[in-house]
Amino acid sequence: MARAVGIDLGTTNSVVAVLEGGDPVVVANSEGSRTTPSVVAFARNGEVLVGQPAKNQAVTNVERTMRSVKRHMGGDWSIEIDDKKYTTPEISARVLMKLKRDAEAYLGEDIADAVITVPAYFNDAQRQATKDAGQIAGLNVLRIVNEPTAAALAYGLDKGEKDQTILVFDLGGGTFDVSLLEIGEGVVEVRATSGDNHLGGDDWDDRVVEWLVDKFKGTSGIDLTKDKMAMQRLREAAEKAKIELSSSQSTSINLPYITVDADKNPLFLDEQLTRAEFQRITQDLLDRTRKPFQSVIADTGISVSDIDHVVLVGGSTRMPAVTELVKELTGGKEPNKGVNPDEVVAVGAALQAGVLKGEVKDVLLLDVTPLSLGIETKGGVMTKLIERNTTIPTKRSETFTTADDNQPSVQIQVYQGEREIAAHNKLLGSFELTGIPPAPRGVSQIEVTFDIDANGIVHVTAKDKGTGKENTIRIQEGSGLSKDEIDRMIKDAEAHAAEDHKRREEADVRNQAETLVYQTEKFVKEQREAEGGSKVPEDTLNKVDAAVAEAKSALAGTDIAAIKSAMEKLGQESQALGQAIYEATQADAAAAGAPGGQPGGAEPGADDVVDAEVVDDDQESK
């Protein structure tokens, strides 16, 4: 069965993790890094670059490089490249495809399932767009999980013996969340969450860019905002400066040849940015994190002193000003620093993927009922309908009410297990009852029925008792994109993957051919320049020269089949040359005789073999 992974699809960087022997492991990408920049670029030769390679070429390919697209998730943003429109889910899918490939390379097997995290403050459209991106990337998205919940799982705080109140402060590249969770005796409950989907590290970078633009304009009179390439260089320098100021009191920003003046003379940007100045120009951004924190505290009605642990998530929380603000808001509590804030969410997602793996859609097949069967109800609680050790066949029903006013549908999630919180049990499947008439919360009555036959097959139905409407089990794939659009994007992604494979194969063939040409030319040259002349006839060397010329001619073109053919011929001629040299060397040795008077240069008895043991001195001395 294919493995499932946990993915943190971030604004600035993305991370993938997988369970190995029950423990989560962050997977390094093909470039050797544990984080992958969420950057996608369309090169002019048709190649699509993702991650660090895309980020590296951004300066020279500004208009065809996409970054921070997560900020547009769920909206109608799109970009047109070479007369083709790309949506946010499509661009995000490119990042997910790379993470998928890197994880498959690490595991040595295919990956089909994934848990993908989103900010807790994401709305339904943003969550669906994230799920669409996963589908386009060829992933079966088991669940969209809130980042604070994943972070709490990764920190292992859900294993505490006593009740604990956890504050998760998540400041990423483009979004901000603060959530309060109550944890105890295996129960994990999100009490309240608040945030800002347009506040993150990118905004701090933008302030530094604005500061640099103003400084340069003041000294040169030139407005760099009109130069896209210069602005990309400023953005990269700003991000680097922000990171350096987390550990230093000041940093130098030096960008040679940033632009030219009216006389075409090159101009240089050289500024010194102190941590104090950086904090001054970004103070209002920091202050924007206060209101969501205060909102969460007010919504739960707890005191700041009741917070037991503070968890920092997201690379932007490394900024000293952010850490100090969190300590101030929480009454001086030191944040928990047990896990890398860049990786903690992906680690939690991998743990959640381990919980959810094994889901079967539409038909739930159980060999026996050793564990209780139930559904998730409000607060994430596991409500049991059939207790463990129940004799089958059996049929049980229970009536539930809606949790919100005018709730139009009910998502029925079926679990197996004994834990009190549904998420801690095994998710077997889910389906949705739609078309519930508008009514205040608690008025609509939904009857859920579990029917287990003698074969152990479980059938689950949900019925609105008011209208008599009944739905069969089906996984609802409601989408911001139509099914046809998603199918088209999936096919495009698959075709692109095939193109990538072809390009890599072509590059490998070219590299092999070029290496063979170089080595062969060098070998032939050494033979001709050898003392006493070459040991093989000139016509043999000429044949090799001809094969080398043919290979070079093929390499100058684009026909890979021709390159392979020329390389094969060159390989044969090279082998023939090697054989000729070997035979010539043997003939010379035979003609000259050898020490000891034996033809062929062997001493008498040289063919005798002596058996011996190799003794380890250390072992012998013991």
From Swiss-Prot:
PROSITE patterns (alphabetical):
HSP70_1, HSP70_2, HSP70_3
**GO molecular function terms listed in the Swiss-Prot or TrEMBL record:** ATP binding; ATP-dependent protein folding chaperone; unfolded protein binding
Where do the segments described as Disordered lie?
Answer: 589-608
Coiled coil ranges (UniProt) are none
Family that this chain belongs to? Belongs to the heat shock protein 70 family.
Q: Which UniProt keywords apply?
A: ATP-binding, Chaperone, Nucleotide-binding, Phosphoprotein, Stress response
What does this gene product do?
Acts as a chaperone.
Q: Which residues carry this modification: Phosphothreonine?
A: T175
Name this protein carries in UniProt: Chaperone protein DnaK
Any Pfam family the entry gives: HSP70
Glycoprotein keyword on record? no
Q: Which organism is it from?
A: Mycobacterium ulcerans (strain Agy99)
Which InterPro entries has this protein been placed in? ATPase_NBD, Chaperone_DnaK, Heat_shock_70_CS, HSP70_C_sf, HSP70_peptide-bd_sf, Hsp_70_fam
- Kindly summarize what the UniProt induction comment says about this protein's expression: By stress conditions e.g. heat shock.
This protein's gene is called dnaK
Q: What domain of life does the native source organism fall in? A: Bacteria
Q: Biased composition, Gly residues: where in the chain?
A: 594-603
